[in-house]
Regions:
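Polytopic membrane enzymes that build or remodel cell-surface glycoconjugates and lipids
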Residues: 1-432, 438, 454-459, 463, ...
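Register position in tetratricopeptide repeats
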Residues: 402, 436-437, 470, 504, ...
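TPR/TPR-like (Sel1-like) alpha-helical repeat modules
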Residues: 564, 571-592
Length: 594
C-alpha cells in the first residue's frame, strides 16, 4: 500500500522536465563526460562534493541521456525506499505507530520538492543511507544495552560515510545517535567510544562542505552579521515547523526576510524557541519526554541549513522545502506515536483521523507534484505566491526568450533587475535578448553592466564578445571571448563564438580547433558542427567538411542552414545528384519556418 501510494501521489512529476539547475547538472557538468567519475570523486572541479549522488546521475546518463523520465522514476523509487526504511527503523527502535509515521512521510507535501526536482536527488540518497545507518546500529545494539563493534556496526559506519558522500548536511546525525542511546540508558564510555568515528566523519565532511561552499562560489551569498544569522536561525526553525504541521502555499522560492540589526523583534522567534525548549526540558519526566526528543532531533538536523554558514541557494531565499527533508522525520515519528496512543483509546476515531490526514496530505502532494511538469508552470506558481522573486522572473524570462517570446521575456528580465539591480546574470540575460532581437547597442550596454558588476561572469564576456564581433569590433570581441574561456574553459558556446570570430577575421585554421572543442564539450551542438563543416572546406578539407555536415543533418534533420551548406559543398565536389536534394530540403525547411 505504501509504495502504491507513493507512486500515485508523485506520478504527475515523473513526466516532468528539467527545472532550474537540473539543466546545469547535465549540460555543463562532468556527468556527461566519459572521465566524469574521476572529476566527480578526485578533483575540486564541482561546486559541491556529493560524489555518490553525482555517480548515480553519471550512470543514469548512460541509460536515459537527456530524457527526464528515468531520473524522475529513480527519485520516486528512492523516496518509496525511504518510507519503507523509516517504517523499519521506527519498528526496530520499538516506536508505536511506525507505519503511520512512514505513511505521513511518504505523502507529505514538503517532500515533493526533493522528489520532483532531479537535482535534489542528494536529499533522497542522504536520507536513505542515514536510515540504513540507524537501522544497522540498532541491529548492533545501539539502544539495547549491548552495543558492540560487530558486522552491523561496520555496515552502519559504511552507510554513514555513503550518506555524507551523498550530501554533507546529514552530518548532525551522530548527535541524534547519541540521543537515542541517552533515551535508552545513560551513555557509557564504550558507547561514546563506538560513536566517536561517526563524530569524526561528521566533522571532517562538515569542514569539507564549508570549504566547497566558500571556494565553489565567488559571489557574496549573504552579507549578514553573526547576530543577524543567530536571530534568523530562530525564524527558520519556526518556519519549517509551520510547514511541517500545515503544508500550504509551498513554493520553490520563498520571500527573503529582512533582518534589520536594530530591530529587537527579530530576536523574538529565537527567544520563543529557547522558552519552548526550556519548557519541554522541565516537563521531560512525563509525557513530554518524546516531544522533547523529537523537538531536539528536529532542531539538530536543521543546524546545517539555519544560515550559520552560507549555502548558495540562500542568495535567493533563506528557506526551502528540501532543507527540512532530513529533519522532518522526528516530528512525524512523534505524530505516529501520538496516533498509536489515541488508537489504543479511541480506535475508530484514530483510524478515521489517520485516513483523512493521509488523504489530505496525499491530495496536496499530488497537486504540488503537478507544478513540476515543466519549469514554466513552476515559476508561474512561484510568482503567484512571491511576485517579488527576482530569480523566478529571471528564469521565466530565460524560458520565454528561448521560446521566442521576446517581449514577455524582456519584461520579466526588466522586472528582475528592478528588484535586484546588481544581478549581473540578469543584465547578461537581458543583453542576450536584445542581441537576438536586433538591438545591439542596448545589448552592449547590458553586457558591459554585467561585466562591471561581476567581472568573472563568463556568460557576460561571451555575450559582449559575440556582440562586439557582430558589430564590427573584431579585436575587442576576440579579447572578450578569450576572457570568457579563461574564466570557463569548458564553455562550448564561447568556443563556437570564438571560432566564428576567428573565421570572420580570416583565421580559418585557428577556428577549426575551437569548433572541435565545442563539439567535444557538447556533442549535440548543431551550430558548432555546421560551422566546423564550412570551415573545414575553407582550409582545403572538403571531403571532411562534407562528412561533418552529413552527420549534422543526420542528427538534426530540421536544420536548414546545415542542409544548404551541405548542398554547397557537394556542388563544389561535383556531386550534383546529391547536392540538389540537399538544396531542396533546405528550401522546404525555410519555407515551413516562415
Amino acid at each position: 500500500m505504501l509504495l502504491a501510494l507513493v507512486a500515485a501521489v508523485y506520478w504527475p512529476a515523473v513526466h516532468g522536465g528539467f527545472v532550474w539547475d537540473d539543466d546545469a547538472y547535465f549540460t555543463y557538468n562532468r556527468i556527461k563526460a566519459p572521465d566524469g567519475l574521476y572529476h566527480i570523486w578526485l578533483t575540486t572541479d564541482c561546486a559541491d562534493y556529493w560524489p555518490v549522488t553525482s555517480t548515480t546521475l553519471w550512470l543514469e546518463w548512460r541509460l536515459w541521456g537527456g530524457h527526464t523520465f528515468g531520473y524522475h522514476l529513480t527519485n520516486l523509487v528512492l523516496h518509496g525506499g525511504e518510507a519503507l526504511l523509516l517504517w523499519a527503523v521506527l519498528r526496530r527502535l520499538g516506536l508505536r505507530g511506525a507505519y503511520v509515521a512512514a505513511l505521513l512521510f511518504a505523502v507529505h507535501p514538503v517532500n515533493v520538492e526533493s522528489v520532483a526536482w532531479i537535482a535534489e536527488r542528494k536529499n533522497l540518497m542522504a536520507m536513505l543511507f542515514a536510515l540504513l545507518t540507524v537501522l544497522a546500529l540498532a541491529r548492533a545494539g545501539l539502544t539495547a544495552g549491548r552495543f558492540q563493534a560487530n558486522r552491523w556496526y561496520g555496515l552502519s559506519l559504511l552507510a554513514f560515510l555513503l550518506a555524507l558522500l551523498s550530501k554533507a548536511s546529514v552530518a548532525p546525525l551522530p548527535v541524534v545517535l547519541l540521543g537515542l542511546v541517552g533515551w535508552a540508558r545513560r551513555p557509557s564510555r564504550r558507547d561514546l567510544g563506538l560513536l566517536l568515528p561517526f563524530f569524526g566523519l561528521a566533522v571532517a565532511f562538515a569542514k569539507l562542505n564549508v570549504w566547497f561552499e566558500e571556494h565553489g562560489y565567488v559571489e557574496v551569498v549573504r552579507d549578514v552579521s553573526p547576530g543577524g544569522r543567530l536571530a534568523g536561525a530562530g525564524m527558520v526553525v519556526w518556519f519549517y515547523l509551520s510547514k511541517a504541521l500545515l503544508p500550504l502555499r509551498l513554493i520553490m522560492i520563498y520571500p527573503n526576510w529582512a533582518l534589520p540589526a536594530g530591530d529587537f523583534r527579530i530576536w523574538l522567534p529565537l527567544g520563543a524557541a529557547a522558552a519552548f525548549s526550556a519548557w519541554l526540558w522541565r516537563a521531560r519526566a512525563g509525557a513530554a519526554r518524546g516531544a522533547l526528543f523529537a523537538w531536539a532531533d528536529f532542531c539538530v538536523m536543521l543546524v546545517p541549513v539555519l544560515g550559520f554558514t552560507d549555502i548558495y541557494f540562500m542568495r535567493y531565499a533563506l528557506v526551502a522545502d528540501h532543507y527540512q527533508h532530513l529533519a522532518m522525520i522526528a516530528l512525524l515519528a512523534l505524530a505516529g506515536a501520538g496516533w498509536a496512543r489515541w488508537q489504543a483509546w479511541r480506535p475508530r476515531g484514530a483510524t478515521a483521523a489517520a485516513v483523512v490526514t493521509v488523504g489530505a496530505l496525499a491530495t496536496l502532494s499530488w497537486s504540488q507534484a503537478g507544478l513540476y511538469r515543466d519549469a514554466e508552470t513552476l515559476y508561474l506558481a512561484t510568482l503567484r505566491e512571491n511576485p517579488d522573486s527576482w530569480l523566478a522572473h529571471n528564469n521565466l524570462g530565460m524560458l520565454w526568450a528561448r521560446d521566442g517570446r521576446v517581449a514577455e521575456a524582456t519584461a520579466h528580465f526588466r522586472r528582475a533587475l528592478q528588484l535586484n539591480p546588481n544581478f549581473a546574470q540578469g543584465h547578461s540575460n537581458l543583453g542576450v535578448t536584445f542581441a537576438d532581437s536586433g538591438h545591439p547597442a542596448e545589448a552592449l550596454a547590458e553586457f558591459r553592466t554585467a561585466v562591471q558588476l561581476e567581472p568573472i561572469l563568463a556568460d557576460a564576456h561571451n555575450g559582449l564578445g559575440n556582440t562586439l564581433v557582430e558589430t564590427g569590433h573584431l579585436e575587442e570581441g576576440l579579447a572578450e571571448l578569450r576572457e570568457a574561456l579563461r574564466l570557463q574553459p569548458d564553455y562550448p558556446e564561447a568556443r563556437n563564438n570564438l571560432g566564428n570570430a576567428l573565421a570572420k577575421s580570416g583565421h580559418w585554421a585557428a577556428a577549426v580547433p575551437q569548433y572541435e572543442e565545442a563539439l567535444r564539450l557538447r556533442p549535440d551542438f548543431p551550430a558548432a558542427g555546421n560551422n566546423l563543416g564550412v570551415t573545414l572546406e575553407k582550409t582545403g578539407r572538403l571531403a571532411e567538411g562534407i562528412v561533418r555536415l552529413q552527420e549534422v543533418v543526420r542528427l538534426h534533420p530540421a536544420y536548414a542552414d546545415a542542409w544548404f551548406n551541405l548542398g554547397l559543398l557537394l556542388h563544389e565536389a561535383g556531386r550534383e545528384a546529391e547536392a540538389r536534394p540537399a538544396f531542396l530540403e533546405a528550401a522546404q525547411l525555410r519555407a515551413d519556418a516562415r
